[in-house]
Structures are given as C-alpha cells and as structure tokens.
Amino acid sequence: VLSPDDKKHVKDAWGKVGEHAGQYGAEALERMFLSFPTTKTYFPHFDLSHGSDQVKKHGKKVADALTLAVGHVDDMPQALSKLSDLHAHKLRVDPVNFKLLSHCLLVTLAAHLPAEFTPAVHASLDKFLASVSTVLTSKYR
C-alpha cells in the first residue's frame, strides 16, 4: 500500500521525467532485453537493436501506461484494467517480466535523475512499480 508520502514522491519524480518519459521507457526496455535476454521472446517481430523505432514506440506505450497509473494512483485497478486484460489474456506475459522491467526502470530513472533519486524516492518508486505489476497480473488468476 502506498502511503501519502509514497504517492507524493512518485508524482514528484514522474513529474521530473516529463517529456523524457518515452525515451526513458525505451531505454528501460533496452536494458531489460540486454540484461534479461529471455524477455526478447515476447517481441519476436521487433527490431530490438539500439534505437529501433519499434522499441521507442513500445517504450512510449510503457511510459504512457505509467503516466496513467501515476494519475490514477488511488484507482490503478480501474485505470489499468484494459492493459491487465491484454497482458493476461492475449499476450500472456509471464508475471516475472514485470519485475524485471520494473528493475530496469528504476536503474534508468536513477541514471537520469540522480539528485531526485533519494533512498526515500527509490523506495516509493519501487513500491509503486510493484503495485502496477500487481494490477497488471491480477487477471492471471
């Protein structure tokens, strides 16, 4: 459960991401593909090379979903319901992959926002991404 302080940290940090959200989303995906090569199996039709348009577009989708979640932090299950259905029923993404992407997102944010990425903000973002992952995997059951 996100505390009021967690919610403030997440909103403030994501606000700093701003117009770079798509770029950071793509960078996190690239990190995930390089660090955890098995995640590539969900993207057999993608050009996964550095800077590919497909990775950039999907990175923007990831960032847009996170922006939606930040904006609806008190009602993520409703806000992310369609995305949860998609990942559970159509794409059938193994839930562990959300944890891997979350880790890569944290690394990316820490690299780009070192001054803002305090231990408290790190913990809040980690809890937020875990909450998003829980929502996205809730319809697997």
UniProtKB/Swiss-Prot annotation:
Signal peptide: none annotated. The gene is HBA. The keyword Transport applies. It comes from the Eukaryota. CDD domains: Hb-alpha-like (cd08927). GO terms for cellular component: blood microparticle; haptoglobin-hemoglobin complex; hemoglobin complex. The modification N6-acetyllysine is found at K16. The modification Phosphotyrosine is found at Y24. Heterotetramer of two alpha chains and two beta chains. Disulfide bonds: none annotated. It comes from Theropithecus gelada. Transmembrane segments: none annotated. The modification Phosphoserine is found at S3, S35, S49, S102, S124, S131, S138. The modification Phosphothreonine is found at T108, T134, T137. GO terms for molecular function: haptoglobin binding; heme binding; iron ion binding; organic acid binding; oxygen binding; oxygen carrier activity; peroxidase activity. Heme b binds at H87. Keywords: Acetylation, Heme, Iron, Metal-binding, Oxygen transport, Phosphoprotein, Transport. SUPFAM superfamilies: Globin-like. This is Hemoglobin subunit alpha. The keyword Translocase does not apply. Involved in oxygen transport from the lung to the various peripheral tissues. The modification N6-succinyllysine is found at K7, K11, K16, K40.
